[in-house]
Amino acid sequence: MELRSIKTFHTIVKFGSFYKAAEILNYSQPTISMRMKQLEQDLGVLLFERGKSLQLTKAGKLFYERTGDLLMQYEALKHNLSDLKEEEAGIINIGVSEPTASLIFPEILKDFLMDYPKITVNIKVDDANTCSQKLLDGTIDFAVCGEPELILENYYHPFFYDTLNVIVSDQHPLAEKKAVHLSDLAEERFIFTPANCPIRLQIEQHLHRELGNRYKKMELTSSMSHEYYVRENIGISIFTSTAHSKPFNGTKVIPILNLDITPPIGLLTNQKEVHFDRATKDLIARITKRFQQRSKELEGTSDKTITG
């Protein structure tokens, strides 16, 4: 029994004649008749009453009722497969903030693009507020970033909370310490991100409460460049554990015991984009899973610091 025979049967019933069905399906009438005869042979029952008017037998009525859902499911499946084909050749535009863009995203995309070789992924590396604006403008599909300033049309869902450490040159006196308090950082030169960075503002509030004016500062707009300046002992930098998750020669990462700032990383979406295609949903799931793993890694590091 072929699916095209079932479709032909439904067309005959719908339009009330073999002749009309032949016109609709672009077949000859003998072909239609032969197909129905073969279908009846396959089923072992008569579907039509033989006579002047087209009428269904009891078996024909039952077959018509039960196969209606089958045809609907088949059409839905064809539609889904068509969507899938389009997804596999689509484009995903993503906004990503540092250090996620440099240190986390490459390993996620490597596996994703192996599974979706026809997908084109474009990465826009920006801070959280710029990602939020690009999402509003429609130039990106979603973003993975810190928490931006509130915009009514955009939704932010944090799925990871980072911790902060201080990074120093391995020639710096603090490099001998396993952990520090903020008071240990008095009179140091801090290398900061720009003043409009939310985490920078929080860090400076804590420093000011603890040290007053007993520290110096300089700005470096490229967050991923800080460790190069630190290595030359130009200053020290307070940054996320993720940013310094991979060892950088000539530097030392030290936990800060009394700095209770946990910068979030999360998914930023727009209310208009509530229905992502399958490939995009899969990519978001992989991103979330990777940051769940990162949370466990941080917990393990924290336990070692406490017991050490």
From Swiss-Prot:
All copies of the HTH lysR-type domain together span: 1-57
Q: Is Zinc-finger among the key words of this record?
A: no
Q: Keywords in alphabetical order, please.
A: Activator, DNA-binding, Transcription, Transcription regulation
Q: Which BP terms in the Gene Ontology apply to this protein?
A: regulation of DNA-templated transcription
Tagged with keyword Cytoplasm:
no
Family annotation (PROSITE patterns): HTH_LYSR (PS50931)
Q: Which residues bind DNA?
A: 18-37
Could you state one GO cellular component term attached to this entry? cytosol
For molecular function, the Gene Ontology terms on record are: DNA-binding transcription factor activity; sequence-specific DNA binding
Function summary: Positively regulates the expression of ytmI operon in response to the availability of sulfur sources.
Q: Which family does it belong to?
A: Belongs to the LysR transcriptional regulatory family.
- UniProt xrefs under PANTHER family: HTH-TYPE TRANSCRIPTIONAL REGULATOR YBHD, HTH-TYPE TRANSCRIPTIONAL REGULATOR YTLI
Which named protein is this? HTH-type transcriptional regulator YtlI
Q: Which gene encodes it?
A: ytlI
